[in-house]
């Protein structure tokens, strides 16, 4: 089992966020239940006048007669092409559902399955042609209640500027290649390029290099572990990375991590106030040294008003200087990784940010699971937009890792368990040890990654974000999560 640890907020904070998110959702469920403006085509389900799920009224509810295994069939009147279903639940009970189709109302073929419906759930699949559509609730905590089931043949307007950003680390394997004295420099370069896996970058538009570079309270910018890493390894890796990405037309962005740990916020404050000029000079100098196309910042998290006031001022000055001092001038991008709570960015700051990577996957749903469709996609993006960011600035974040219920700090790469879950399954039962009980680990499957991509695309958001690329399978693997993004985008842009 491949295991990796990511710095996340404390369990206490996660639980508070989870409860707050669910509470807000409860209070605004009718808003999301009527959120159907992003698919500009006929709702085919309205042709069936006999079912409360298809009457076009969010106020009415279809009640299943059994918790598990209940079915309802929609008759479209004739065989139709469609590729999307929107489901709207009253309450938060459904834990597993499937969608099947038929032309004779007797023999059904399953085309989709997943776990939760919640207040708003987009389900996407390859275009099918059928007359009858069956919703089966396989498992539910209580009797399922469905407000609406909408069926569409969604054909969105083609976009050429949809972003697919990915956070990625250099990877320890690079060090071994560079240290191998039996290899020539050319052989080392070839092996490093193999690790980069260029196939991803037919889909990815922005590669955000994270984990290597930090700043400190004195305004210095340096390698995270030692200068030897930069001198011996980093320059070689960046040269090879540039060669691969430049050929694909992919932007290369650097995340410069802030001081963290004990008194981390105090150290950040000192750097962005007393040593601001030095810090900005060093950030831009590092970006110019390796010809990064942009700078990305990930302060987790400014909390007080004083911290936000200082950060707002710092970001505005950083962007202004990037326009004149970065090697690519006006084309240089400034991006932020954002949590989905307690943001206090001013309109002036928001205007100078090119895009934000929304870490909605940190929010837990009512069952303590991270990154469900509604909480991490619909609700998270909506919150960021309410704060003043435009749709075009927002990248909706996807986790390529799983974690236990409750947002535990141990997190596991998708590529470690991909052979053991289906494209529709988000759960993996993991035995922690021989002495402890099995635990559910929640991942994002290919199906939900495709659905979230479709939601971002159809709703007009700027793009999506992957955290983290090294958790995925190789680009040529049919089970790759990046492939799920790519397949949808190829379908709508062909």
Predicted segments with their positions:
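Disordered, acidic Ser/Thr/Pro-rich linker "stalks" and the adjacent N-terminal cap
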Residues: 16, 24-78, 90-93, 152-159
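Trp- and acidic/polar-enriched beta-sheet ligand-binding modules for extracellular glycan
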Residues: 67-69, 91-153
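A short beta-strand element within beta-rich, extracytoplasmic domains
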Residues: 79-91, 135
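Glycan-recognition patch characteristic of GH18 chitinases/ENGases
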Residues: 156-283, 370-372
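Substrate-binding surface in catalytic domains of secreted glycosidases
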Residues: 171-183, 217-233, 301-421
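Conserved, mostly hydrophobic/aromatic
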Residues: 207, 297, 356, 396, ...
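Glycan-binding loop/region signatures in secreted carbohydrate-active enzymes
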Residues: 254, 391-455, 475, 481-494
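Active-site groove signature of glycoside hydrolases
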Residues: 280-308, 360-362, 465
């Amino acid at each position: 089992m491949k295991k990796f640890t990511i710095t996340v907020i404390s369990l206490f904070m996660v639980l508070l966020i989870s409860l707050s998110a669910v509470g807000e959702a409860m209070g605004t469920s009718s808003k999301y239940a009527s959120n159907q403006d992003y698919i500009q085509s006929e709702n085919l389900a309205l042709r069936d006048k006999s079912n409360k799920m298809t009457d076009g009224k969010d106020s009415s509810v279809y009640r299943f007669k059994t918790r598990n295994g209940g079915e309802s069939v929609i008759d479209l009147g004739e065989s139709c092409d469609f590729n999307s279903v929107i489901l709207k639940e009253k309450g938060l009970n459904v834990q597993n559902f499937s969608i099947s189709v038929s032309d004779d109302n007797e023999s059904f073929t399953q085309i989709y399955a997943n776990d939760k419906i919640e207040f708003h759930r987009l389900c996407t699949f390859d275009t099918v042609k059928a007359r009858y559509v069956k919703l089966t609730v396989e498992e539910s905590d209580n009797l399922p209640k469905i407000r609406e089931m909408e069926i569409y043949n969604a054909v969105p307007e083609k976009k050429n500027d949809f972003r697919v950003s990915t956070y990625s680390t250099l990877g320890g394997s690079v060090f071994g290649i560079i240290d191998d004295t039996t290899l020539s420099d050319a052989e080392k370069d070839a092996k490093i390029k193999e690790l980069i896996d260029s196939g991803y970058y037919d889909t990815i538009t922005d590669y955000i290099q994270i984990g290597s570079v930090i700043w400190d309270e004195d305004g210095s910018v340096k390698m995270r572990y030692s200068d030897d890493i930069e001198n011996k390894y980093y320059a070689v890796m960046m040269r090879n990375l540039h060669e691969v990405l430049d050929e694909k037309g992919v932007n290369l962005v650097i995340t410069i991590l802030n001081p963290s740990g004990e008194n981390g916020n105090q150290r950040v404050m000192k750097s962005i106030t007393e040593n601001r000029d030095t810090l900005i000079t060093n950030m831009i100098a590092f970006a110019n040294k390796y010809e990064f196309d942009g700078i990305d910042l990930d302060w987790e998290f400014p909390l007080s008003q004083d911290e936000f006031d200082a950060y707002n001022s710092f970001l505005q000055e950083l962007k202004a200087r990037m326009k004149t001092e970065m090697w690519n001038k006006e084309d240089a991008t400034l991006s932020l990784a954002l949590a989905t709570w307690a943001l206090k960015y001013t309109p002036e700051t928001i205007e100078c940010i090119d895009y934000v990577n929304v870490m909605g996957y940190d929010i837990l749903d009512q069952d303590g699971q991270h990154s469900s469709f509604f909480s991490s996609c619909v609700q998270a993006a909506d919150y960021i937009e309410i704060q003043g960011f435009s749709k075009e600035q927002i990248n909706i974040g996807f986790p390529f890792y799983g974690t236990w219920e409750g947002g535990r700090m141990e997190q596991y790469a998708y590529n470690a368990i991909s052979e053991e879950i289906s494209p529709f399954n988000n759960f993996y039962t993991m035995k922690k040890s021989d002495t402890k009980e099995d635990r559910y680990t929640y991942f994002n499957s290919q199906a939900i990654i495709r659905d979230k991509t479709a939601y971002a695309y159809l709703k007009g958001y700027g793009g999506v974000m992957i955290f983290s690329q090294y958790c995925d399978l190789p680009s040529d693997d049919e089970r790759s999560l990046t492939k799920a993004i790519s397949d949808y985008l190829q379908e709508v842009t062909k």
